[in-house]
Amino acid sequence: MRLLILTVLAIAISALTAPAQQRPLMTDDIDITPAGSMEIAAGVDFYQNAKFPLSGIRGDMTRIGDIRIRTGFAANVELQIEGTIQNYVAINSMGPSAIPLNVSGNSTNDFDDFTISAKVKLRNETRLLPAVGLKFGYQMPNTDQARGIGTNQVNIFTKIILQKKFGDVVGTTPRFNAMGNIGLGIMTAPIERFTQNDVFLYGLAGIYRASDHVNIVSEVNGRINTRNGPAPLGTESIGQFRVGTQIRASGLRFDAAAAFGLTSFSPRTGVTFGVTYLSPHIFTPAR
């Protein structure tokens, strides 16, 4: 019993000190959730001038319940599920639509296309070389394309993750944590039969530990169309620059960030707020 209590306390303390967690970043880190524990994050996003080329809709989008769940199954293996419970768009304009729509009035809403993925840490960081990992997964077709927000297609992706920590140690963690992602996404073209678009995935992020409880975070993240001409509708290049903060308090990590679009198909600006909780050990993975 004493050993059990000490173990639970140790894991609870690690929730306060764990570095390089995702929210509010979109760039993946290399850190693995402790085996048998779950990290649960939820947030709200607000975007101005969001574009949906497939439906021709432009408007201000609110994402309610941006959920990210990470579960460790081994010291170097983690499963993830992420998506938004409900997307709302206040329509500012409607251009020509490539698909039939079921939209009335000046707003629309829909469920999100959820993503399921696995992350594997392949190599630990050394004094000179970064840690290396691999993430792969797929996006499920959960949306109703007639609502004008999602594309309701299956998309798959894989990416390589690099991470290196620098600087003097604060507590048990170096002050600066740099993360990089590079990968390939295969996106189904919604209105072109037997067609896909292979997009280049990228992400570069940094987390600066200002104090024991406050981090400053920033990143660029997105995808790039690899075709010589225009991308098939619904697979265009998008990207964001984000800058924000993470604050640890009361066993939780709160976050906030501002977002700025990097391409003509990205939302112009936005803000995101969220909270993350790391559970104690709740199950024992199979061996």
List each language-model region with its residue ranges.
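Bacterial N-terminal signal peptides
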Residues: 5-15
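Transmembrane beta-barrel domains of Gram-negative outer membranes and organellar outer membranes
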Residues: 20-287
